[in-house]
Regions:
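Conserved anion-binding
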Residues: 79, 89-150
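Alpha/beta catalytic cores of nucleotide-metabolism and tRNA/nucleoside-modifying enzymes
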Residues: 1-29, 113, 170-180, 187-220
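Active-site mouth loops of central-metabolism enzymes
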Residues: 5-21, 60-76, 97-103, 124-136, ...
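Alpha-helix-loop-beta-strand connector modules within alpha/beta enzyme cores
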Residues: 43, 47-67, 102-129, 162-189
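Glycine-rich, proline-tolerant flexible connector loops at the mouths of alpha/beta enzymes
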Residues: 28-48, 63-70, 90-108, 155-163
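Structural motif
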Residues: 34, 85, 117-118, 143, ...
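Glycine-rich phosphate-binding active-site loops on the catalytic face of alpha/beta enzymes
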Residues: 61, 65, 84-99, 146-162, ...
């Protein structure tokens, strides 16, 4: 698989707590240069990044991140604010406590409400696989498939574990055909990226593929 094809499916990501505006601009420059799908950045940086890229790159941001236990009303407000500020894509975190309590109807309602708040923008639902049983993951595949969201996503990258090949395969076997898959967290190199894409991932959340592309340019 050509590295350009992999880069085109990467959300070039910087979600570190103390990231600066200068770092976000550099992230955007790299994403534009290497033809990434989007930059995934904190909500507070969306408006500035939108002005900076000036239509040259899609802006993705996160909602209820990273713990997911904000109220639904708070997540809806966050989503509306992000869209107003120029976000093209929204990655939301579900309430994992409600998963453990099997509050399936509440979880579905939350995703539906956030999708409505997206105003037509793309929605990815982060379920934090490292904290779930396979049975819970399968149930969430069903819920996301019914919600109107476009993507199911493996991980925040902050939950103690990232994407695994097993989880991407499980998603592929259990989501509806219209739901795409984003693998995120722990994608360390080009081989990881290629493996996830071959297993059925449509998008990758990582910064390391751009780093790999830079290293290749230098002949490293």
């Amino acid at each position: 698989m050509d590295i350009k094809d992999i880069l085109a499916r990467c959300d070039h990501t910087l979600l570190r707590t103390d990231c600066t505006a200068a770092e976000i601009r550099a992230l955007c420059d790299d994403a534009i240069r290497f033809g990434c799908a989007s930059v995934c950045i904190p909500p507070a940086h969306v408006a500035g990044a939108k002005r900076y890229v000036n239509g040259r790159m899609k802006i993705c941001t996160v909602i209820g991140f990273p713990n997911g236990y904000n109220t639904t009303a708070a997540k809806v407000f966050e989503t509306e604010d992000a869209v107003k500020n120029g976000a093209d894509e929204i990655d939301m975190v579900i309430n994992l406590g409600m998963v453990k309590d099997k509050c399936w109807d509440i979880l579905l309602d939350e995703i539906v409400r956030i999708k409505a708040a997206c105003g037509g923008k793309l929605l990815k639902v982060i379920i934090e696989c490292c904290l779930l049983t396979d049975e819970e993951k399968i149930k969430l595949c069903e819920i996301v498939s019914a919600s109107g969201a476009e993507y199911i996503k493996t991980s925040t990258g902050f939950g103690g574990g990232g994407a695994t090949r097993e989880d991407v395969a499980l998603f592929k076997a259990n989501v509806a055909p219209h739901v795409k898959i984003k693998a995120a967290g722990g994608i360390a190199n080009l081989q990881d990226a290629e493996d996830f894409l071959k297993l059925g991932a449509d998008r990758l959340g990582t910064s390391r593929i751009v780093k790999a592309a830079k290293a290749m340019e230098k002949g490293e």
